[in-house]
Amino acid sequence: MQLKRVVEAKLPTPWGDFLMVGFEELATGHDHVALVYGDISGHTPVLARVHSECLTGDALFSLRCDCGFQLEAALTQIAEEGRGILLYHRQEGRNIGLLNKIRAYALQDQGYDTVEANHQLGFAADERDFTLCADMFKLLGVNEVRLLTNNPKKVEILTEAGINIVERVPLIVGRNPNNEHYLDTKAEKMGHLLNK
């Protein structure tokens, strides 16, 4: 286990009341959060989203990505389902950090795509560690999920880490003229399953 469960509190939202559960990485002290809606106990697979932190999309309403749209759509679907989990995976910019993400944006403004920009900065296309998310699910007592994602690599890594993904639920929202090239690159170079 790479994490410990530290604290929880009620979080009222426009979609209803969630239980916010805080986790801390044992090696680094970095924190992550789960939003739990309804009763996730029992043997029925839970609708879940692993949402990687995106300050620009989630909080600043950026149209460069689909992250903020996905966050809102996931919370809506979880609330409509009556139960579910959103893991807020605190690895900003596919885990290159906020300042490097802004540097990558500057390179994209010069014509590089999102993958090329990461490579120019000395990073892999995706630096995230989804095994942390498997540990969060386990600490919540959940081993079977219906995963809201377009990323088959996320499904693969969580499965290898012991989470049974019984269904991949597409989450295709937020395409606009500002992020079309970004989304096309994620599909073509990173294998994301996106429809136009």
Curated annotation (Swiss-Prot):
Its cofactor is Zn(2+). The active site is at D126, R128. It comes from the Bacteria. Binds 1 zinc ion per subunit. It catalyses: GTP + 4 H2O = 2,5-diamino-6-hydroxy-4-(5-phosphoribosylamino)-pyrimidine + formate + 2 phosphate + 3 H(+). InterPro entries: GTP_cyclohydro_II (IPR032677), RibA (IPR000926), RibA-like_sf (IPR036144). One of its GO terms (molecular function) is GTP cyclohydrolase II activity. Zn(2+) binds at C54, C65, C67. Keywords: GTP-binding, Hydrolase, Metal-binding, Nucleotide-binding, Riboflavin biosynthesis, Zinc. Its EC number is 3.5.4.25. CDD domains: GTP_cyclohydro2. HAMAP family: RibA. Catalyzes the conversion of GTP to 2,5-diamino-6-ribosylamino-4(3H)-pyrimidinone 5'-phosphate (DARP), formate and pyrophosphate. Homodimer. Belongs to the GTP cyclohydrolase II family. This is GTP cyclohydrolase-2.
